[in-house]
Amino acid sequence: THVRDAYNLAIGERTAEDIKIKVGSAVPLKDELDVEVNGRDVITGLPKTVRIESEEIRRALNKPLDEMAKAVKDALDATPPDLASDLMYYGILLTGGGALLRGLDVRLRDETGVSVNVSPTALDNVVNGCARVLEANAFDGGFVQTNA
């Protein structure tokens, strides 16, 4: 949406994801980055290339990142005291592809006051967790069954 609005450039989801991976960040970078983006001019219908800087992508990501930080703070506010103590000791573990956004751990740490770590296997954790659920036959009728 940002690229379309700012540059009248239509791009696909994969291109948008590539932009985020190549230059996206949650905090200012020591050395800002830029990326060349190819797409279709929505006015002329012709191919078009633009150069986009990391600072611009960071501004575009700011609202969803603020919402993420608010969700984390809300979860922390609702956390029972015993678990809150564990969180302060162990910190928050980010996982999944989004965890790899440059500086997301720093931004969440700064906004929550809780240490934040990125899983060294962030990209594999979701699929590995799903595999464990399936291997344990814990998925039944739309719900995960636990041995309570």
Functional labels for PLM-detected ranges:
Residues 24, 28, 84-108:
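Glycine-rich phosphate-binding loops at beta-strand->alpha-helix junctions
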Residues 60-87, 133-137:
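Phosphate/ATP-binding catalytic cores across multiple sugar-kinase/actin-like superfamilies
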Residues 14, 56, 63, 67, ...:
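Conserved active-site and cofactor/substrate-binding residues in soluble primary-metabolism enzymes
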Residues 9-17, 31, 132-148:
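Acidic, glycine/GT-rich loop-and beta-edge segments that sit at the periphery of enzyme/chaperone cores
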Residues 1-62, 77, 87:
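Phosphate-binding glycine-rich/basic clefts of nucleotide- and phosphate-handling proteins
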Residues 19, 72, 94, 130:
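Residue-level signature of catalytic and energy-coupling elements of molecular machines
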Residues 106-131, 140, 146-147:
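Conserved phosphate-binding/catalytic loops in two-lobed NTP-binding clefts
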